[in-house]
Structures are given as structure tokens and as C-alpha cells.
């Protein structure tokens, strides 16, 4: 092993250790449910839009056992770190997948049909669109079992068939779990159900860049495995999609823009639909620790707008029949939605007026997929004085922080996190006690 490889592996190991320390503390103080979860997280229907979803339709997140990767210290920004876990036995928790799916079926008119808010061309092609997911990976045997997965998929397929609906179902999973599924005896049982659900398999991917994906985000995913899963899905006639993150620590905002843009281009070349995930700031995560110490900042609203503009321009080049070109995760993020997002971030450069304009147009585009709204928004914010401040910030970042080698930046942040972690946890405990006293 070369010194560079050894340094890389050492950074991965140390980052995982920091993440585990934060998550163990969180699990120790988190609410432990005395029963299995009876219904999934599915957000609310606000201003004609399903919240906490990937688009103008509901997303059902059915937590069972915690995600293995969370417990192992992977996925540093983890959105689901604060999802309560159950105190019941493992087998009872596994069964909650079926219980929560039954809740969806019993309330189908209200939370599936009632949460449809498409305004684009696909509105007339699909009667219902929804996303179906666990905390981490639906095909993970640590989170669900073959028998509960089969039962849950069968229940959904039967309900849709009974109602004579044309579905589009987004299913979230980890690449390696999905590869295990493809080579297992479960495949012959589940695959026909996936076809009945008109499934799009959504992989956690985050970035096409190895350093960004596996060192900053800590995804622990090889490009070889990802491309293998995509190739198999293509041969099977199942559309693949992939999540792309846009809030990496240790990077300048120009670097984030370029990283996401290059990743969108890579996915599009493989005919994989990109799902843009804007960052929020979950407590007890490495990004939150670095943010509290002034060593990380959320992307500016103008950066978010530029990321989508680039995504839209690239994905328009390759049309996908009867599918979305792209999806955009909830701008405020959850569950549970954290207190801080890139719109209310106190360190953002964009003024409150431009921030509001950007937020409104991104919300509208999520629902309508009408990217022509971009030009209206860009015109409204182009002459504001914060535009010049934003450009100056990008230049300043690139000339100072951006001149350092990326590995050096990451190493400095991890070293700081190791030293600061105890103080951060003490700060969080003090903050939570103060909040309890105010109740």
C-alpha cells in the first residue's frame, strides 16, 4: 500500500470513529419507542406540495432496525440520525415494515392519492407516484427480511392492481444490498412485484468523484459496484436513479457546484436519473459539529439555484420515456426536519428577498418541473447587491481555502473534530437541557 493509500484509509477510519462517537451519544439520549412503529413518516401536504419527499408525490419512510451504515460510522451527513428506534425485539421490529405498509393501504385515498400534486406531462401517464423507503436501504437484511419485503411489496402491488392504477414507484436502496438481492433466491419472487409497481430503483451514490463520495461523504461505495448495478437494471428493464449530495464539508462552493454538475453528467451518460439532495444540518453529525465551530458552511441559496440550473441543462439532452428527467429532494429536509437549512442559515450571503425568491422558484419547479421559471428568478435576483457579494465570496473561497490540497483540508477538519468532539457534545447537552426547561 502506498503512503497516499495509507493516509486515505487512515482518514476513513478516523472519520468513522468520530461519526460513531456522535451517533452512540445520540442513540443514548434518543427516545426509545416501546412499540413497533404503526405508521411511516410521510410528511405533510402544504401549499399543494408533499413535504419531506422527492417531488410532487408522497414519500413513505418506514423505519425498522437502524441502518447498518449509520451504526458503522458511514454517511457523515446522515439525514435519519434522529429517527427514534424501538426497544422491542429484532423480529418484532422487522414486522413493522408490514404494519406500516398496511397503514399506507388503509389510508390510500388520503395519503397516496391525496398527496399527488404533479403538474407536469407525467400527470396523465401515471395515476399515482410515490416513494417507498426505509431508514437506509430497503434491501438490507439488517433493516428488513426477505419475508417482510415480499409481503410488503405484494400488499402494495395487490392494492394498486385492485384499484386498476398506473403506478410509478421510487424504491430507495444501497447498491451493495441490491446486488446481493439480484444474486439471491429472493430475486425470482420480488422481481415480478417490482415490475407490477413500475419501480425505479434509487441508489445512494452522492458523487461520481471517489474522494468526495468515499472520503468526505463516507459512502463506502465503489464505482465498479455502482456501474454493475446500473448495467443489470438496464438489462432487466428497470430504470435506475441515484442520489447526489450537494453539501460536502472541506470544499468551496465552486467545488461543490462542479462536483454535482460532473456527477449529473456522469449519471446522464449512463441513463441514470439524478436526484438532487440539498443539504440540511442534522444535529449530532460531523457537518453540524464543523458548522458549530465555524469550519463548515451550508451552500448559499444562489449556489443551490446554480446546481439545479446545471442539472436541468444536462438532463434535457437525454429524454427518458415515461420517467422524470430529475428529482429534487425536499428543500428543508427530514425526517425529522432540522432547525437549520440553507435558506435560514445565518451565514448565507444572499439577502432575505433573494433567498425568498429562490426558495419559491425551487419549490414551484419541484412540483411543476417547469424549468422555464429559472429565467424569471435569475432576472429578479441579478441586480441585487448581494449578487456581487456572492461572486466575491466565491472568488475569496477559491483563492484562500480552495488553494489547499483537498486531502489536507479534510485531514485538518477530521483532526479538529477529534479534538473538539467532547466540547461539542457538552454544548449539545447544555442546549437540550435549556430547551427542556423552556417546555
How should each PLM-predicted stretch be described?
Residues 81-104, 111-148, 159-181, 198-225, ...:
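Core AdoMet radical
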Residues 137-139, 173-177, 207-209, 246-250, ...:
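Active-site-proximal loop/turn and secondary-structure-junction residues that shape catalytic pockets
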Residues 224-285, 303-331:
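Conserved C-terminal portion of the radical SAM core fold
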Residues 146-157, 185-192, 198-200, 252-272, ...:
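Short, electropositive alpha-helical surface patch
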Residues 115-125, 156-164, 185-198, 230-237, ...:
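Acidic (Asp/Glu)-rich catalytic clusters
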Residues 47-103:
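Canonical Radical SAM [4Fe-4S] cluster-binding loop centered on the CxxxCxxC motif
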Residues 2-26, 279-439:
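Auxiliary Fe-S-binding modules of radical SAM enzymes
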Residues 98-115, 119, 149-158, 184-191, ...:
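Generic structural signal for well-ordered alpha-helices
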Amino acid at each position: 500500500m502506498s503512503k497516499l493509500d495509507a493516509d486515505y484509509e487512515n482518514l476513513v477510519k478516523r472519520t468513522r470513529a468520530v461519526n460513531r462517537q456522535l451517533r452512540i451519544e445520540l442513540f443514548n439520549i434518543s427516545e426509545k419507542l416501546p412499540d413497533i412503529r404503526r405508521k411511516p413518516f410521510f410528511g405533510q401536504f402544504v401549499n399543494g406540495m408533499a413535504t419531506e419527499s422527492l417531488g410532487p408525490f408522497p414519500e413513505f419512510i418506514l423505519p425498522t432496525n437502524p441502518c447498518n451504515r449509520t451504526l458503522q460510522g458511514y454517511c457523515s451527513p446522515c439525514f435519519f440520525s434522529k429517527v427514534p428506534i424501538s426497544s422491542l425485539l429484532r423480529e418484532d421490529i422487522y414486522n413493522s415494515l408490514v404494519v406500516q405498509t398496511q397503514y399506507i393501504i388503509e389510508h390510500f385515498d388520503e395519503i397516496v392519492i391525496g398527496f399527488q400534486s404533479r403538474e407536469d406531462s407525467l400527470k396523465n401517464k401515471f395515476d399515482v407516484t410515490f416513494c417507498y423507503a426505509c431508514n437506509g436501504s430497503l434491501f438490507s437484511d439488517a433493516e428488513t427480511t426477505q419475508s417482510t419485503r415480499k409481503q410488503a411489496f405484494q400488499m402494495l402491488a395487490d392494492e394498486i392492481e385492485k384499484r386498476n392504477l398506473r403506478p410509478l414507484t421510487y424504491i430507495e436502496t444501497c447498491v451493495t444490498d441490491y446486488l446481493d438481492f439480484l444474486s439471491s433466491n429472493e430475486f425470482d419472487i420480488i422481481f415480478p412485484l417490482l415490475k407490477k409497481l413500475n419501480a425505479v430503483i434509487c441508489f445512494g451514490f452522492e458523487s461520481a468523484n471517489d474522494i468526495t463520495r468515499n472520503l468526505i461523504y463516507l459512502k463506502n461505495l465503489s464505482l465498479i459496484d455502482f456501474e454493475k448495478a446500473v448495467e443489470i437494471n438496464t438489462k432487466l428493464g428497470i430504470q435506475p436513479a441515484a442520489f447526489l449530495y450537494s453539501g460536502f464539508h472541506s470544499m468551496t462552493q465552486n467545488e461543490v457546484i462542479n462536483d454535482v454538475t460532473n456527477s449529473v453528467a456522469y449519471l446522464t451518460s449512463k441513463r441514470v436519473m439524478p436526484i438532487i439532495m440539498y443539504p440540511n444540518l442534522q444535529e449530532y453529525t460531523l457537518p453540524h459539529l464543523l458548522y458549530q465551530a465555524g469550519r463548515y458552511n451550508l451552500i448559499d441559496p444562489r449556489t443551490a439555484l446554480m446546481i439545479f440550473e446545471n442539472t436541468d441543462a444536462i438532463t434535457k439532452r437525454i429524454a427518458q420515456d415515461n420517467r422524470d428527467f430529475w428529482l429534487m429532494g425536499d428543500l428543508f429536509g427530514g425526517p425529522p426536519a432540522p432547525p437549520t437549512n440553507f435558506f435560514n442559515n445565518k451565514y448565507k450571503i444572499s439577502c432575505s428577498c433573494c433567498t425568498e425568491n429562490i426558495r419559491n422558484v425551487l419549490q414551484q419547479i419541484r412540483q411543476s418541473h417547469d424549468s422555464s421559471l429559472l429565467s424569471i428568478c435569475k432576472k429578479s435576483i441579478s441586480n441585487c447587491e448581494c449578487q456581487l457579494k456572492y461572486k466575491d465570496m466565491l472568488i475569496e473561497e477559491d483563492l484562500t481555502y480552495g488553494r489547499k490540497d483537498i486531502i489536507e483540508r479534510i485531514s485538518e477538519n477530521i483532526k479538529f473534530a477529534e479534538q473538539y468532539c467532547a466540547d461539542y457534545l457538552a454544548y449539545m447537552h447544555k442546549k437540550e437541557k435549556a430547551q427542556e426547561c423552556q417546555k
